[in-house]
């Protein structure tokens, strides 16, 4: 699967898609393949603060529970409630199934993240 060129990525396998000062955050195709079938998503509430590099929730699969790490610091503006009843949407379309949306406190943080080519090189080294 191709990694969207307009997204930015973390070494913990999260992605962020920007729309102005709002970032939609999810997990990459590489992450969902490593996890297997996702059965539960634990996410923060609207209004909660998230910090770059810190955990903001977790995904549970048939194999393991994996922490989610925020790529940016900010405030949660939306939670994808569809994932509460259909967490497998992450397996089906990992780069469309956002988990939370965040009002980004410092847009410069996004520039420090990996672009698609750098992320693909990173996962090639990990494999």
Regions found by a protein language model. Give the residues of each.
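Short, Lys/Arg- and Gly-enriched loop/turn segments at beta-strand edges
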Residues: 58-69, 86-88
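Acidic, low-complexity mobile loops and tails
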Residues: 1-55, 92-127
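Charged, alpha-helix-enriched surfaces in structured cytosolic catalytic cores
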Residues: 71, 85, 114
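Short, charge-rich, low-complexity interaction segments located
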Residues: 76-93
